[in-house]
């Protein structure tokens, strides 16, 4: 199984890259992961609602193009309105995917959200939190949760649960 993280934006602050890299390094023996950075749409200083929709559309097309390159993979989209999963539920979903031989593309949208087209094609809509999280922090939290879930699946002591 391979998980590709399709994320809008690049040039993350050093603390984000350091945190992400730590969990990315730790997870590799358990799960192959790859990061695909998608350029954010160029934004106006005071964008209108129409501009915001255009940014989501442009980024959405790039997300779907990156997803299409891989062939057969499930599309999981991080969305505030998505289903919340416990770490144990995530571990189960990843385990099921591994048994079925499914690859996963996990989408972190841009600052203005994800296009309706991407949401419509999503196999899973997942909310990390009811809180609004900054996109750079989502990268770190996502990778840590993937690592924690895989630790559960491999009986690694990292996750001690409740």
From Swiss-Prot:
Keywords: Cytoplasm, Methyltransferase, rRNA processing, S-adenosyl-L-methionine, Transferase. It comes from the Bacteria. It holds the Pfam family SPOUT_MTase. The keyword Chaperone does not apply. It is an enzyme of class 2 (transferase). One of its GO terms (cellular component) is cytoplasm. It catalyses: pseudouridine(1915) in 23S rRNA + S-adenosyl-L-methionine = N(3)-methylpseudouridine(1915) in 23S rRNA + S-adenosyl-L-homocysteine + H(+). One of its GO terms (molecular function) is rRNA (pseudouridine-N3-)-methyltransferase activity. Its main location: cytoplasm. The keyword Cytoplasm applies. Its EC number is 2.1.1.177. S-adenosyl-L-methionine binds at residues 78, 109, 128-133. Specifically methylates the pseudouridine at position 1915 (m3Psi1915) in 23S rRNA. NCBIfam families: PRK00103.1-4, tRNA_RlmH_YbeA. Homodimer. Belongs to the RNA methyltransferase RlmH family. This is Ribosomal RNA large subunit methyltransferase H. It comes from Psychrobacter cryohalolentis (strain ATCC BAA-1226 / DSM 17306 / VKM B-2378 / K5). The lineage of its organism: Bacteria, Pseudomonadati, Pseudomonadota, Gammaproteobacteria, Moraxellales.
